[in-house]
């Protein structure tokens, strides 16, 4: 990967720091997509020894990339997300992976596995994604 491609891709992902989610932090501010992703990854890492049968490297990759599309589309809460929103997010994901030709096939296969949720790793990643959101909602003040 050329340095300019690397930096350009990181610049797109930087949007995850700026794009906020529906949830709030315990300090009363909106959580960013990047903060959510960080904690989902931490959860997978911390639970690695509890689930030795899982390929945790694969789970961590899923956790790390699962919201990359939101760097382009922004976060749409699951209770508001439509089929059209999901299609736009998938288009954004494919546009992003196309910027990484050396990793495009690997990333698209990983996204397909995540969407199908048939493997133990994909099910575990999705459970962590949902669990993190529940934990965050419970940590936020009731007034938010």
Where do the model's predicted regions map?
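Active-site helical microenvironments for divalent-metal-assisted chemistry
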Residues: 1-144
């Amino acid at each position: 990967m050329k340095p300019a491609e690397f930096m350009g891709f990181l610049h797109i992902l930087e949007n995850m720091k700026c794009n906020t989610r529906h949830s709030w932090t315990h300090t009363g501010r909106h959580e960013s997509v990047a903060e959510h992703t960080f904690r989902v990854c931490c959860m997978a890492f911390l639970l690695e020894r509890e689930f030795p049968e899982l390929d945790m490297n694969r789970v961590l990759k899923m956790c790390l990339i699962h919201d990359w599309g939101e760097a382009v589309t922004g976060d749409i809460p699951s209770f508001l997300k439509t089929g059209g929103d999901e299609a736009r997010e998938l288009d954004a994901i494919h546009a992003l992976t196309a910027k990484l030709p050396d990793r495009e096939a690997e990333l698209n296969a990983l996204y397909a596995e995540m969407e199908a949720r048939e493997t133990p790793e994909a099910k575990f990643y999705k459970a962590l994604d949902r669990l993190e959101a529940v934990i965050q909602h419970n940590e936020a003040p009731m007034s938010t």
